[in-house]
């Protein structure tokens, strides 16, 4: 039996991230780490944080109408696997 990787497979070293989205800030939880990191919901803060993330990490966030879009777009452009969930 052979297995194949798909475009949505996480890269080696990738992490799973959950993001609670707000209009002014993002609360970020990383699987295996204790606590939550709060970032301003701005291009600069998000881009800086994404530079420290392993390529191909999986980032899941709630659909908030518009406030999630900045994180979703920047994460996608940075090579992350992005899930926008509609609760």
PLM region spans:
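Phosphate- and other anionic-substrate recognition elements at nucleic-acid/protein interfaces
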Residues: 1-87
């Amino acid at each position: 039996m052979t297995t194949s990787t798909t475009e949505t497979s996480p890269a080696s070293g990738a992490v799973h991230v959950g993001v609670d989205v707000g209009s002014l800030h993002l609360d970020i939880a990383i699987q295996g780490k204790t606590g939550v990191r709060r970032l301003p919901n701005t291009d600069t803060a998000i881009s800086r944080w994404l530079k420290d993330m392993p390529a191909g990490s999986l980032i899941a966030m709630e659909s908030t109408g518009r406030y999630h879009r900045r994180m979703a777009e920047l994460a996608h452009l940075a090579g992350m696997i992005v899930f926008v969930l509609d609760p």
